[in-house]
Amino acid sequence: MFLATLYFALPLLDLLLSAEVSGGDRLDCVKASDQCLKEQSCSTKYRTLRQCVAGKETNFSLASGLEAKDECRSAMEALKQKSLYNCRCKRGMKKEKNCLRIYWSMYQSLQGNDLLEDSPYEPVNSRLSDIFRVVPFISDVFQQVEHIPKGNNCLDAAKACNLDDICKKYRSAYITPCTTSVSNDVCNRRKCHKALRQFFDKVPAKHSYGMLFCSCRDIACTERRRQTIVPVCSYEEREKPNCLNLQDSCKTNYICRSRLADFFTNCQPESRSVSSCLKENYADCLLAYSGLIGTVMTPNYIDSSSLSVAPWCDCSNSGNDLEECLKFLNFFKDNTCLKNAIQAFGNGSDVTVWQPAFPVQTTTATTTTALRVKNKPLGPAGSENEIPTHVLPPCANLQAQKLKSNVSGNTHLCISNGNYEKEGLGASSHITTKSMAAPPSCGLSPLLVLVVTALSTLLSLTETS
């Protein structure tokens, strides 16, 4: 009786806990913008803020003068009370580029572009176990097909993809542009990247991850895994750019900047956690990693002998920024959170679902990526993906800030004073976590309290019976 009670009660409790941290009823930024523009007071403040951001870019208009800066700050403070300030986007949504443009226009700092860049995407809060429950595991599928040889999981995953209409459709859609030669080039890289993004956005994770994160025991399998994204077109180039230059290029594009911020947020390592991930969620890390594929920051396996990944870049010609460059590159290459997530998927395992993930207490700075604060002249306009200003600050996410500060109140962002002053940013630019989008409430909802109470009572009755 006791085990039966747990069997039915624990999934319900896990579902409710996931709902508690999902962010509530936040609007996507497109809907929030439309809603704001219909309200006179919100519309006025929103237009003022957009003029402030545009003016700051060109050192013109409202951005000049103390009075103008006060007006800009007033507009931002007023918008904090609106749904627009707390809006998010969904990866692969119909108007994703427009949504991200609105999001970043809201989160541009007017005092040095140093706002903490949390992920612009609505949290998914999924689990690898959720993916495994969708259909039988890949090896189980092929137990029903006698003529298919066993042993190469990546080959099995590719064949499983061909048996699924959606996976087959989108895989064919990227194979064609990624392998077709165009004039003197190997392929049309732009079309290849777009098709790859659609593949990982549209195809169920069961199949796309099966090809990208399959577990291997031999070189033939690992090489097939490395070739999944057709790296000769989507990944490799004649020369490797400097990683910091590649990062700058990524930050000028709404999609790339957002996917990179999402990766830093969801794959942040933490050695004291059960999974080596700060957020204790392998599925979210793998989703964030796959989201980078099809951008200029496309990562891939470095070779066929390890799970180390990296973008196509190195740290040559870094000059005084060598340490910063290596920190950025090693976030990919030596990321224990990502490696554990890949291994967990390949093994069909997951972070212990029912174990409560208590915050890791630490007073030391959380390892973060080398995200440079730098203002650059604007490039030519015309692309809907282009971003006017492109800055990624040292913190990867709000949760890292909480771990560093050991509190959940109004603390300054986790930017070390040395790095902050080195970049020439004044102390007045500091903001508090309270000024950011409000984090999910840590309090239990009445519904959850009721369920927990009922569960406790039920368990007590089963023990006494």
From Swiss-Prot:
Chief place where the protein resides: membrane
Single Gene Ontology MF annotation: signaling receptor binding
Keyword NAD: no
InterPro entries on file: GDNF/GAS1, GDNF_alpha, GDNF_rcpt, GDNF_rcpt_A1, Glial_neurotroph_fac_rcpt_a1/2
Keywords: Cell membrane, Disease variant, Disulfide bond, Endosome, Glycoprotein, Golgi apparatus, GPI-anchor, Lipoprotein, Membrane, Receptor, Repeat, Signal
Compartments where located: Cell membrane; Golgi apparatus, trans-Golgi network; Endosome; Endosome, Multivesicular body
Membrane-topology descriptor: Lipid-anchor; GPI-anchor
Keyword Glycoprotein in record: yes
Residues bearing glycans: 59, 347, 406
PANTHER family recorded: GDNF FAMILY RECEPTOR ALPHA-1, GDNF RECEPTOR ALPHA
Function as written in the Swiss-Prot or TrEMBL entry: Coreceptor for GDNF, a neurotrophic factor that enhances survival and morphological differentiation of dopaminergic neurons and increases their high-affinity dopamine uptake. GDNF-binding leads to autophosphorylation and activation of the RET receptor.
Name of the protein described by the UniProt record: GDNF family receptor alpha-1
